[in-house]
Amino acid sequence: GWASKIGQTLGKMAKVGLHELIQPK
């Protein structure tokens, strides 16, 4: 459903954000 879709999107954004914090460009 839409809830799981939003959860996946937030998870993906969190992963990317974390990666950006660890290895800033």
Curated annotation (Swiss-Prot):
Entry annotated with the keyword Secreted: yes
GO BP annotation list: defense response
Domain of life: Eukaryota
Cellular component aspect of the GO annotation: extracellular region
Keywords: Amphibian defense peptide, Antimicrobial, Secreted
Known tissue expression: Expressed by the skin glands.
Record's subcellular location: Secreted
Main localization, broad class: secreted
Family as reported in the entry's similarity comment: Belongs to the gastrin/cholecystokinin family. Magainin subfamily.
Cited function: Antimicrobial peptide.
Protein name according to UniProt: Xenoposin precursor fragment BM1
